[in-house]
C-alpha cells in the first residue's frame, strides 16, 4: 500500500502550474513535463505521476457534477423531497446531459428506468400512485430533439412503449408513451474495453419503482432495475437449475419476492447492454419470458458510489486486496453485507433475463441478450465492440469511479459476429482486464543477498538468455534457490533490460551446465588483491535494484523476443539435444511509462552511487599518502639512529632522541618492550639450533 504524500503550498502551486501548462495525463506525451515538475518540486517521479492521475479524476468528477448530473451510483434520498420533484429531477438531468453529449457512435443512449421516490413504508401506496401519475405526465411531455438527428431517428428512439412490470408489492409502474433518455458523459469504461462490477449501497425508507425499456435500432440500452429487499429477512435463494427459473410463470417469481418488500429497501443499480435488431422482450401479464440457451460462466457487473472523497481509501484497499483475491466464489461487502453467489443461476423478474448454466456462449443461440448470472449484465449478440472506439465515450473518463470486482472463476470467452472481439482468460484477479493504463498487479519476488549472489554467479557463468540455451542453468539455479523457473527468467529479463538502458553490453549466453572453475580462480585472485575490492563493490551495489523482480515493459517485450530468437539461431548447435521454442517463454509486461520511470530512477541512483564511491576512493588515496609519508619519516629516523649507535656517536644519538617523530613521542617508554626479549629468544634459539647441527 502506497503512503500518501503531503504537499507544501509551494509544491501545490508548482504542480498546478505544470498542470495548466499541459501536464494533464500520465502518458508519454507528458513524461518530460512530469520529470521536470518532479525535479522542481523535489518529489519522486511516481508521486507527481500519481498526483496527475488524481487531478484528472477530480476534474472529471467536478465537470460531471457541474454539468448537472449526479455521480454514478448515487440516488436522491432526501426524505423532504416529494416524488413529483424527484421525477422532475431525473428529467432535468436527462435533458441537461443529453444536450451536452457528443452523441457519437461510441457513446450510445442510456435509458433511465429506475425512479427513486423516497417515502416511508406506511405511505408507500400513496407515493406509488403519485409517482405513476407524475410519470405519465412526464411521458406526455416532449423531449427536445438533439442536434444532428433526423426525424426518422428521433421517432425511432421514442417509440411508444407501454408495459406493466410486476415488481415488489404495490410497486408496479406503467411506462407511458415517451421514454427518458440520459446520455452519460462520464463513460463507464476506458478505451481498453474492460468489464467492471460495482458495489451496492442500501438506502433505507424509500420505495422504488422500476421500468424496463428496450428500444430497437439502438446498439446499447442501459436500464436500472431497482430491487427491493428486506435488509433483515432471509436472502432469496436462487434455483439450483436455471431451467426452473426460465420455465416458471412470472406470477410465482413475483410472489417469491413479496416477503422482502415490507420494510427497508435496497437500491441496486444495474446496467445492461441490450440487442439492437432483435424483437422486444415481453415482460408482464401471464406471458412467460423467452428462454435463452446461454452457455457461459457468470460475470458480475457493479458500480461504485461515485464518492470522490472515498476514492483514495478504496484504491489503497483494492491494491492491498489485489494479491489475495484469487478464486473467491462469494464475498461480503462490509457496508451493506451483500452476498454475491457464484452460481450459474438467476431469478427471472423485472429488469432481469434468464440464464442457464453452461460453459460456452454462442451468439446465434442468444437472440435477445446474454445474462451473466450474478447480476443483470446483458451483452449484445450482434453489437460490434470496436477496440478503437469502445462502448462508451472515453473523452470524459472517470477511471476510478468504478471498481472492478470480478468473481467469476471460470473461463470466459465472448465472441461477436462482426469483429470477433474476444475476451479470454481466467478472470480470477480483477485487474487482468482492468484499465489499460493500470498495470496488472502481480506478486513480486524479494531476493535475499545470498540469492542475489547466486543469481549473479550464474549470470557471470553465461545465464544471460531467456531461451533454451540457458535452460539447464535456469533449472539449476531455480532448484538451488527453491523458486519457480519463471521467477528466474523474469530476473534475467530485468537484468538484460537494465544493461541495455545503462548502455552495457549483455554478455553472450553459454549453453550446458554451469561451470564455476573460472570464477573460483577469480575469487582467489581477488582475495590476494584486496585493493580491487573497491571496484567490485561498485558492480555489486549497481545491482541493488535486482532485489525486487520487476516485470518487462511492453516496449521491450518484442525486443526481448527478437533477442531470444537471435540467441536461438546463434546457439542452435548447443540446443540440438533439448530444443525449446521461444513461444514458450513467459514474458510478464507492465506499462512503458513504468519502465521509463524505473530506468530514470535507476540511472539517477547509479550516478549518485558512483559519485559516492569516487569520493570514497579519493579519501582512501589521501589516507594512503599520509601513511606513506609517516612511514618514510619513521624509516629515516630509524636508519639515522642505528647509524649513530653503530658509530657510538653520543651527540648524534642525543640529537635524534631530542627530535623524535610525533608517533614515537606518543609511545610509553617506561615499560620494557617485548621486542628485545623476542630478539634474544630468537638469537638463543638460533644458537641452540646451530649447536645441535654441529653435534
UniProtKB/Swiss-Prot annotation:
It is found in: Nucleus. Residues 3-63, 440-503 bind DNA. Its main location: nucleus. GO terms for biological process: regulation of transcription by RNA polymerase II. Residues 56-81, 653-695 are annotated as: Disordered. CDD domains: homeodomain (cd00086). InterPro entries: HD, Homeodomain-like_sf, POU_domain_TF. Residues 679-695 have a biased composition (Polar residues). It comes from the Eukaryota. One of its GO terms (molecular function) is DNA-binding transcription factor activity, RNA polymerase II-specific. Keywords: DNA-binding, Homeobox, Nucleus, Repeat. Gene3D superfamilies: Homeodomain-like. One of its GO terms (cellular component) is nucleus. SMART domains: HOX. This is Highly divergent homeobox. The lineage of its organism: Eukaryota, Metazoa, Chordata, Craniata, Vertebrata.
Amino acid at each position: 500500500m502506497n503512503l500518501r504524500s503531503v504537499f507544501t503550498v509551494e509544491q501545490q502551486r508548482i504542480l498546478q502550474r505544470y498542470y495548466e501548462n499541459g501536464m494533464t495525463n500520465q502518458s508519454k506525451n507528458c513524461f518530460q513535463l512530469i520529470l521536470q515538475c518532479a525535479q522542481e518540486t523535489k518529489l519522486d517521479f511516481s508521486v507527481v505521476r500519481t498526483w496527475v492521475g488524481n487531478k484528472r479524476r477530480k476534474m472529471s468528477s467536478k465537470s460531471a457534477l457541474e454539468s448537472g448530473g449526479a455521480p454514478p451510483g448515487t440516488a436522491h434520498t432526501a426524505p423532504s423531497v416529494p416524488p413529483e420533484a424527484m421525477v422532475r429531477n431525473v428529467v432535468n438531468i436527462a435533458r441537461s446531459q443529453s444536450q451536452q453529449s457528443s452523441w457519437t457512435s461510441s457513446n450510445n443512449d442510456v435509458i433511465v428506468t429506475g425512479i427513486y421516490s423516497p417515502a416511508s413504508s406506511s405511505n408507500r401506496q400513496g407515493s406509488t400512485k403519485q409517482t405513476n401519475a407524475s410519470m405519465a405526465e412526464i411521458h406526455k411531455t416532449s423531449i427536445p430533439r438533439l442536434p444532428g438527428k433526423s426525424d426518422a431517428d428521433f421517432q425511432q428512439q421514442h417509440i411508444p412503449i407501454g408495459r406493466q412490470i410486476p415488481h415488489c408489492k404495490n410497486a408496479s409502474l406503467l411506462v407511458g408513451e415517451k421514454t427518458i433518455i440520459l446520455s452519460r458523459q462520464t463513460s463507464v469504461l476506458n478505451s481498453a474495453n474492460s468489464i467492471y462490477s460495482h458495489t451496492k449501497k442500501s438506502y433505507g425508507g424509500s420505495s422504488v419503482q422500476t421500468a424496463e425499456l428496450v428500444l430497437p435500432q439502438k446498439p446499447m440500452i442501459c436500464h436500472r432495475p431497482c430491487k427491493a429487499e428486506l435488509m433483515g429477512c432471509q436472502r432469496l435463494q436462487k434455483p439450483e437449475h436455471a431451467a426452473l427459473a426460465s420455465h416458471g410463470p412470472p406470477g410465482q417469481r413475483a410472489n417469491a419476492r413479496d416477503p422482502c418488500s415490507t420494510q427497508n429497501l435496497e437500491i441496486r443499480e444495474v446496467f445492461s447492454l441490450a440487442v439492437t435488431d432483435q424483437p422486444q422482450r415481453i415482460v408482464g401479464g401471464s406471458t412467460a419470458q423467452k428462454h435463452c440457451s446461454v452457455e457461459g460462466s457468470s460475470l458480475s457487473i457493479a458500480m461504485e458510489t461515485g464518492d470522490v472523497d472515498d476514492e483514495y481509501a478504496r484504491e489503497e484497499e483494492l491494491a492491498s486486496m489485489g494479491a489475495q483475491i484469487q478464486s473467491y466464489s462469494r464475498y461480503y461487502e462490509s457496508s451493506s453485507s451483500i452476498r454475491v453467489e457464484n452460481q450459474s443461476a438467476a431469478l427471472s423478474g423485472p429488469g432481469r433475463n434468464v440464464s442457464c448454466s453452461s460453459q460456452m456462449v454462442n451468439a446465434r443461440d442468444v437472440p435477445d441478450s446474454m445474462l451473466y448470472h450474478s447480476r443483470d449484465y446483458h451483452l449484445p449478440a450482434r453489437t460490434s465492440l470496436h477496440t478503437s472506439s469502445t462502448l462508451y465515450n472515453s473523452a470524459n473518463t472517470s477511471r476510478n469511479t468504478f471498481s472492478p470486482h470480478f468473481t467469476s472463476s471460470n473461463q470466459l470467452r465472448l465472441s461477436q459476429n462482426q469483429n470477433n472481439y474476444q475476451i479470454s482468460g481466467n478472470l480470477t484477479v480483477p485487474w487482468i482486464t482492468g484499465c489499460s493504463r493500470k498495470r496488472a498487479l502481480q506478486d513480486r519476488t524479494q531476493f535475499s543477498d545470498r540469492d542475489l549472489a547466486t543469481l549473479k554467479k550464474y549470470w557471470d557463468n553465461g545465464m544471460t538468455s531467456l531461451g533454451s540455451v540457458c535452460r539447464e542453468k535456469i533449472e539449476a539455479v531455480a532448484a538451488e534457490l527453491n523458486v519457480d523457473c519463471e521467477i528466474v527468467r523474469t530476473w534475467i529479463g530485468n537484468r538484460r533490460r537494465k544493461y541495455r538502458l545503462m548502455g552495457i553490453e549483455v554478455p553472450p549466453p553459454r549453453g550446458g551446465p554451469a561451470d564455476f572453475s573460472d570464477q573460483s580462480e577469480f575469487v582467489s585472485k581477488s582475495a590476494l588483491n584486496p585493493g580491487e575490492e573497491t571496484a567490485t563493490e561498485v558492480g555489486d551495489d549497481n545491482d541493488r535494484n535486482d532485489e525486487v523482480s520487476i516485470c518487462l515493459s511492453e516496449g521491450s517485450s518484442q525486443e526481448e523476443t527478437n533477442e531470444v530468437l537471435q540467441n536461438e539461431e546463434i546457439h542452435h548447435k548447443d540446443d540440438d539435444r533439448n530444443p525449446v521454442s521461444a513461444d514458450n517463454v513467459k514474458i510478464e509486461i507492465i506499462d512503458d511509462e513504468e519502465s521509463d520511470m524505473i530506468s530514470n530512477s535507476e540511472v539517477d541512483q547509479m550516478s549518485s552511487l558512483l559519485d559516492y564511491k569516487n569520493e570514497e576512493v579519493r579519501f582512501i588515496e589521501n589516507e594512503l599518502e599520509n601513511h606513506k609519508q609517516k612511514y618514510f619519516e619513521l624509516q629515516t629516523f630509524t636508519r639515522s639512529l642505528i647509524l649513530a649507535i653503530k658509530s657510538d656517536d653520543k651527540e648524534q644519538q642525543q640529537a635524534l632522541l631530542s627530535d623524535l617523530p610525533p608517533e614515537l613521542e606518543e609511545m610509553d617508554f617506561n615499560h620494557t618492550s617485548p621486542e628485545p626479549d623476542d630478539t634474544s629468544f630468537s638469537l638463543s634459539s638460533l644458537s641452540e639450533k646451530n649447536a645441535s647441527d654441529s653435534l
